[in-house]
């Protein structure tokens, strides 16, 4: 079995993938409604449908029911396992590869490893978020449609097709349509924006987590406690999430296929940034920052906690 060293532990690649996958599933289940609110807040242009995260969640629950807050969760739960597994395992592998002695911390090498992890994960992240965003934003578009229909009954607020199609899209339907009309590139719309967000995030997150976690390493066990790893993951995750929020806003706007009446479309990152700055002001770049911190902090706290508990190793031992 292929293995590499992480601190004083020998963790197999298989165990790392299992740990990352389990952590992703648990984390997404816990924080998905907040992520949905983040997407809807970031996509608001002009008149706001939602005043903030709490208002968004309350209106969503009333209009769409409890399950409405989990629109798009199936896509995330399906693909977050390989995504988080690749991200965590790639960072660990690259850190081992770049720091052969394993003793002295090197910030540049840690940042480079984080950069590599961000690049590796995007093969899953981009199509996953592409599909997830369409499902998450469907409820907001339905509200916009109803509001504009009440004001001008003959208006058509966005694209062609039936209202029910927009209200109840499915990931399979969206994926098939994108592949039919645009090919594989349709699923990778916003790839550049995704890289611009995920690479800086990983460059900030992984070195920051490693150094924060190192502060709690016990001399007896040679590793940090679960609680310390969890807190370190939450802290590093929230800092990195807020730092790259402007890039996440651009990515969300670019990947959103259907727009409400009067909402802008974008040809790329530069066009999106320019329109956002001139039409909505600099504050628009930080839309959903609080939601992102609340999503990413526990998501990566749980991820690192599970990773360091070593659930993957225990599962593999059951099959030995």
Swiss-Prot record:
Family: Belongs to the mitochondrial carrier (TC 2.A.29) family.
Mitochondrion in keyword set: yes
Annotated InterPro entries: Mit_carrier, Mito_Solute_Carrier, Mitochondrial_sb/sol_carrier, Mt_carrier_dom_sf
Listed Pfam families: Mito_carr
Topology of the protein relative to the lipid bilayer: Multi-pass membrane protein
Modified residues (Phosphoserine): 150
Record field: catalytic activity: L-glutamate(in) + H(+)(in) = L-glutamate(out) + H(+)(out)
Residue spans of the Solcar repeats: 11-97, 105-215, 224-313
Function: Responsible for the transport of glutamate from the cytosol into the mitochondrial matrix with the concomitant import of a proton (symport system).
Matches recorded under PROSITE patterns: SOLCAR
GO biological process: L-glutamate transmembrane transport
GO MF annotation: an example: amino acid:proton symporter activity
Disulfide cysteine pairs (residue numbers): none
Protein name listed in UniProt: Mitochondrial glutamate carrier 2
Subcellular location: Mitochondrion inner membrane
PANTHER family: MITOCHONDRIAL 2-OXODICARBOXYLATE CARRIER 1-RELATED, MITOCHONDRIAL GLUTAMATE CARRIER 2
Keywords: Membrane, Mitochondrion, Mitochondrion inner membrane, Phosphoprotein, Repeat, Symport, Transmembrane, Transmembrane helix, Transport
Transmembrane feature ranges: 17-37, 66-86, 110-128, 190-210, 230-250, 293-313
Organism superkingdom: Eukaryota
Entry's Gene Ontology cellular component terms: mitochondrial inner membrane
